[in-house]
Amino acid sequence: MHQKARRNKMEKRSNRNQKGPILQVARESIHFFKNYRQWSNKTFIVVLLIVVAISMALTLLAQGIKGIPLTSSSTTVVSQTADSKEKTTATEQETSARIMANGDLLYHIPIYRTALKEDGTYDFHENFEYVKPWLKQADLVIGDFEGTVNKDHYLGGYPLFNAPGEVMDAIKDAGYQVLDLAHNHILDSQIEGVFSTADAIEKAGMTPIGVYTHEPRDKAPIVIKEVKGIKVALLAYSYGFNGIEEYISKEDYDNHLSDLNEEKMKAEIERAEKEADITVVMPQMGIEYQLEPTEEQKQLYHKMIDWGADIIFGGHPHVVEPAETVEKDGDKKLIIYSMGNFLSNQRIETMQDEENAKWTERGVLMDVTIKKKAGKTTIETAKAHPSWVNRTPKGTYSPEGYPLYLYQTYILDDFIEGGKYRSQLDEATKERVDTAYTEMNEHVGLKW
């Protein structure tokens, strides 16, 4: 008790001693202010600053002696700022992007004829009049350009596709950023056509995938598009090249083409999975005009998911095949086995011998929203918008005497009952549109 009383007494004396200098400075300051008129303005300011500085120093010294941390206030500010930065960073990491993709852009000769102008050039913009507003809503748009562009080769449709260079202007203007060239028609204008087609795409301001024209396949980087802070890897593969690969060297085949070699695909998809936030694969395989995928398709596409693919946009059959969701590690992945045709001259009127002829004029516009949160990217929503190619007689003829048609792709949401363009359709077209819309939704069966 005596020791505690003695300690309290010493602390009080210490506190009195600490207050003494402060009170003394205060008294002197009062005395100064009473007599400040005796000083010049300059001298007054200098002395005032000295007095304030001494007062602040003594106050801080007194607080330090009493055990009050001199930096407590600034530490709190730093801590709050750090917390704010963490919250801001977390918020910045929560981002979403919308990806759209469609199937074959298949330019048959009748489409060229209609696009030909009097001056000998071509204009394909009207093909995408009703598609463009949809594509412009997306952050990344991917199409499958099934053919080549080679000005040193004759124009052609089936079986050797080679389109005028102007197609790329229209495709770019519609909103596409990436075009898949891994398909069975990429050699239709020889190995030179691989390079000229990729070059035409790049000159139009887009990116080709599925061919390698700058570096050999085994040395080329994975194509990754950063969209709103999300890195999207893009890979594409083809089952074959219509036998034309037999007429090119093994070196050209290995260096420039992207086939379904499982060892190579596995390595590339695994690499993409490490380098990007989400991986999109566009394989071309299956049986033409068949509405269901083969067992080979199912097995391989599921392997791709196992290797690291998140989204698989399939193609080749020229008709739409169903979609499927696959759960992996608690997250849903997306497969659509075939997106069908998005623009072509294949239809009921031209494919009368084909059992599924009506399906060749139909396709889907895949509409997928991906979300990145806290470093993890997942598929948030996925939709398959039915599409249909309308072919309307223009009432005019080509110089060779062929009838000309207006080819336009419709996103059927806009043309069914209640759609903004419904009133433009005649009764026969309304029935065709409504049937296509209903059958397509049932067939694709995508419920996310």
Predicted regions and their residues:
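Acidic, metal/ion-coordinating pockets
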Residues: 2, 11-15, 20-36, 41-448
